[in-house]
C-alpha cells in the first residue's frame, strides 16, 4: 500500500537537490555577469554544451536506477552490487570519451556554431577546465542512481548541498581571484 507521504519522503530530497543545483546555476550567472558579457556568454554557452554531453551519462544512469530499484524490490542486494560494478565499468569509458569531446573536439563544434571570436575563445577555455569535472559528474550519476534505486534519497540532498557550497565558494574564489587564487573570470 503506497501512500502520498511515502512518495513525498522519497521525492522531497530530490527536489531539494534540484533546487541546490539551480542555485549553483544562478550563482554562476550572477558572478559571471559581474565579470562581463563575454564571460557570461561563454559560461552560458559552455554550460549548455556541457549539459548536452552529460546527458549521455544521465540516460545511462537512469536505466541503472530502474534496474537497481527492481532488484531492491525483489530483495536481491547482491545483484545491486553487480549492477553498480557494471555501471562503473561502463561509465568510465563514457567519461573518457566525453572528456575528450569536451577537451579537444568541442572547438570544432563551437567554431561552427559561434560567431563571436571572443565568446568562441572564452567558451573553449571554459570547456577545457570544465572537462575535468566530467569524471566526477558521471561517477556521481551512478551513485545517485544507486541511492534513488534504494529509495535513500536524503543522501542526494546532503551531497548536493555540499556540492552547492563548494561550487559557490570556488566560483567566488576563482572567478574574482580571492584568497590568493588567480582571477580566472
Language-model features, listed with the residues they occupy:
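Residue-level signal for short hydrophobic patches within transmembrane helices
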Residues: 4-23, 27, 49-56, 132, ...
Amino acid at each position: 500500500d503506497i501512500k502520498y507521504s511515502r512518495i513525498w519522503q522519497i521525492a522531497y530530497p530530490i527536489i531539494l537537490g534540484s533546487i541546490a543545483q539551480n542555485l549553483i546555476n544562478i550563482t554562476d550567472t550572477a558572478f559571471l555577469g559581474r565579470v562581463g558579457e563575454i564571460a557570461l556568454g561563454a559560461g552560458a554557452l559552455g554550460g549548455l554544451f556541457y549539459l548536452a554531453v552529460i546527458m549521455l551519462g544521465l540516460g545511462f544512469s537512469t536505466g541503472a536506477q530502474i534496474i537497481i530499484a527492481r532488484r531492491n524490490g525483489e530483495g536481491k542486494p547482491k545483484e545491486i552490487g553487480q549492477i553498480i560494478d557494471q555501471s562503473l565499468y561502463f561509465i568510465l569509458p563514457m567519461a573518457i570519451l566525453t572528456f575528450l569531446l569536451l577537451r579537444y573536439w568541442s572547438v570544432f563544434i563551437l567554431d561552427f556554431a559561434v560567431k563571436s571570436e571572443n565568446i568562441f575563445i572564452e567558451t573553449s577555455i571554459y570547456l577545457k577546465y570544465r572537462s575535468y569535472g566530467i569524471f566526477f559528474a558521471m561517477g556521481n550519476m551512478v551513485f545517485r542512481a544507486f541511492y534513488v534505486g534504494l529509495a535513500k534519497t536524503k543522501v542526494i540532498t546532503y551531497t548536493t548541498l555540499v556540492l552547492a557550497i563548494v561550487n559557490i565558494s570556488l566560483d567566488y574564489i576563482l572567478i574574482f581571484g580571492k584568497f590568493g587564487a588567480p582571477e580566472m573570470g
